[in-house]
From Swiss-Prot:
It comes from Geotalea daltonii (strain DSM 22248 / JCM 15807 / FRC-32) (Geobacter daltonii). Coiled coil: none annotated. Keywords: Metal-binding, Nickel, Zinc. PANTHER family: HYDROGENASE MATURATION FACTOR HYPA. GO terms for molecular function: nickel cation binding; zinc ion binding. This is Hydrogenase maturation factor HypA. Zn(2+) binds at C70, C73, C86, C89. The keyword Zinc applies. One of its GO terms (biological process) is protein maturation. InterPro entries: Hydgase_Ni_incorp_HypA/HybF_CS, HypA/HybF. Involved in the maturation of [NiFe] hydrogenases. Required for nickel insertion into the metal center of the hydrogenase. The keyword Metal-binding applies. Ni(2+) binds at H2.
Length: 110
């Protein structure tokens, strides 16, 4: 379960940026193709924040849908899986634009 190490990293990032103040909420972005299980992150976050500046902090998760750009016709389209063909031309080569995100977007401190 790599969500535990991700949750630890989120706590570390927030602690470094909180300036010694208590953190009330943390907002993270998780892309649809990131491979991160939202419920596991929530569970691990709660466990990792005990006894820290983030204890009892609210974890807000923003889901980022996947989108891609066709290498053949340059069309942008929503992606459900990395091997989806382009709906405009049927091409199979694409570059992901969004969907792999995993980042701390912001935090609220007191």
């Amino acid at each position: 379960m790599h969500e535990l190490s991700i949750a630890r990293s989120v706590v570390d990032i927030c602690t470094e940026n909180a300036g010694g103040r208590r953190v009330c909420s943390v907002t993270i972005e998780i892309g649809a193709l990131s491979g991160v299980a939202t419920e596991s992150i929530r569970f691990c976050f709660d466990a990792c924040t005990r006894g820290t500046l983030l204890e009892n902090a609210l974890l807000l998760i923003e889901h980022v849908p996947a989108s891609g750009r066709c290498r053949q016709c340059n069309s942008e389209f929503p992606v459900k899986a990395c091997y989806d063909p382009c709906p405009a031309c049927g091409g199979v080569g694409m570059d992901l634009i969004t969907g792999e995100e995993l980042r701390v977007k912001g935090l609220t401190v007191v």
